[in-house]
Amino acid sequence: MTSVLAHRGPDDSGGFHSDIPGKSISFSPGNSFADFQPQSQAGAALGHRRLSIIDLGTGHQPLTNEDGTVWIVFNGEIYNYQELRKELIQQGHQFKTETDTEVIVHLYEEQGTACVERLRGMFAFAIWDERRQRLFIARDRLGQKPLFYRQEADRLSFASELKSLLQIPGADRTVDPHAIDLFLAYQYVPHPWSILKGYHKLPPAHRAVYENGQLQIERYWTPPYQHPETNSQFPFQSVDQWSAALRETLTESVRIRMRSDVPLGAFLSGGIDSTIIAGLMQGMSDRPVHTFSIGFPVKQFDERSYAREAAKMLGTDHHEYVVEPAALEMLPRLAWHYDEPFADSSAIPTMYLSQVTRQEVTVSLSGDGGDELFAGYDRYRAVALSQWFDRLPAFARKMMTASIWQKMPASVEQKSFRRRVKRFLAGLSVPPERRYLKWVGIFDTERRQEMYSPGFREQLTDFDADQFLLDAYQLCPDRDFVTRTTATDVQTYLPCDILTKVDIASMAHSLECRSPFLDHHVAELAAAMPLKYKMHKGRGKQILTDTFSDLLPESIQTRKKMGFGVPLNHWFRNELKPLLFDVLLDQRAIDRQIFDPQAVEQLISEHLNLQWDHSARLWSLLVLELWFQTFLDPATIPDHFPDPVLI
């Protein structure tokens, strides 16, 4: 179990076995214990692989308290550990290391499972309480660190990555058809599902106790999305007060994330979020901060000029790399590292960026979370515009949508724009909650049903993949629809897509990525903030731009959001074209009886003949089939993939 996770912790490994007979528990949230066999009759077996960041010499895990009755394995970072440590010492606790890990142990002794509510950081951890004979597991509030688990009759097994659990002898590898439907809808498998039956993800902001063969799971944190007028936590009355609070909170978040005993730097794309983080870091540093960006030969996917301009203004030590993405070489590596089908194609540049960054530093700060917390995506503008449409009389809406569509240019160059407008107009015909599904989904419900074979379609009877997103909308029913949409993304798209992408890509190269926007103090401030300060005249992240204008070049303040993408459309008509036929129409894929081969062939044909841009859909199908070939077809799973030579 440890060998498949060595990339997450190459510096050290260790394990703990309880010798108390009874239930058998195997797990590895930071990674697993190499010598543990699930047939053991131990009360608990804990294992860990370590990436050394704090207290490099004495941070060995599993780690215990003074008398060996509380043991922990921990993956992540606690940024307020120094303050908590001082408090615990005053209460009489004795420490033998300077690590944040040991702080959690003593905090648990003091406060039990409520300790998680005091932690400020990213984490997945497990604590074995010898006296109580119970296991306590928890995941951070926003889902920056992963935690998979499987409960059987006499055992709870869990790990940071699914592939670790599949190393247990006799591990079941039965695919969950509901998970496939969810994957095609969202391009990821959301929590609490996993791609395999019986395996689950602990959702963000949840903790669980396994005791006497029973697993009890509960949520421990919810962002304060109540209406601003009734929110006593943030009693601000003006934009200046909100702006001052934002500056103070985000600055503090950056400061505590710069605590490290190893070299650290920052990703710098040249966008608003990453530039703000790099600028705050530079303001706290007595030497130039290392910043990193990558570019591609295709101009529309290359942000290097903006990153270069930001680095020059901020005075950072900027590292710039140009890579030619080797998609054919990268695909099997993505399938292995991501454990489950994962079709966000920006995982490719994120992998490259993580690899080149790790050549210089061990820790990198990023701007992840800024878009979801402060309404930065274009789709939030679409939501706001749709609310305006909803206020029009029905006949006016019908006339206006027809007029817009008739005036749309029909050229091939405009097909992407036409597709977006068509999706927007189609969404206006359904209730607001389902409207968003039409805008963000890869395959909508009707298209998925067309793609499936009759036999597979029957396995999805009474299952509604849309419900995952619809449930998330209930978090703040009293707020405006744009705020409800951003809140939904914070619960769904952010942890399941963005943070999964970044965690896997960075840890694949033993790089720790820290995101100051994802400090729960920042998230709570953003949740309570009125929309009018985030979005002004259809422009998102307005308060970020205004508050940190001293760190942002004018060109970055006004630039259109680009995104971190790759030229899928081009690839599928060129170097990846043979792969569409060799993989998607291979006999192995057909024999799985998930898709109608004619529907797949039609999708390929429409794309290659320039009838429609199906690149995101084809990428999803390709990723899914390569996952099958990596994890289901072989008798054993390869324990590692070597890194490619990039530069």
Model-predicted regions and their roles:
Residues T69, S453-A487:
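Glycine/proline-rich, flexible active-site/cofactor-binding loop segments
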Residues E87-G92, L166-Q167, A465-D480, A527, ...:
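Short amphipathic alpha-helical segments and their helix-coil junctions
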Residues L552-Q611:
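PAPS-dependent sulfotransferase catalytic core
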Residues L494:
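Globin-like tetrapyrrole-binding proteins
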Residues S24-I25, E87-Q90, E110, E130-L156, ...:
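ATP-dependent adenylate-handling active sites, centered on carboxylate activation for C-N bond formation
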Residues M1-Y338, T350, S354, S549-D550, ...:
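Cysteine-centered catalytic environments shared across enzyme families
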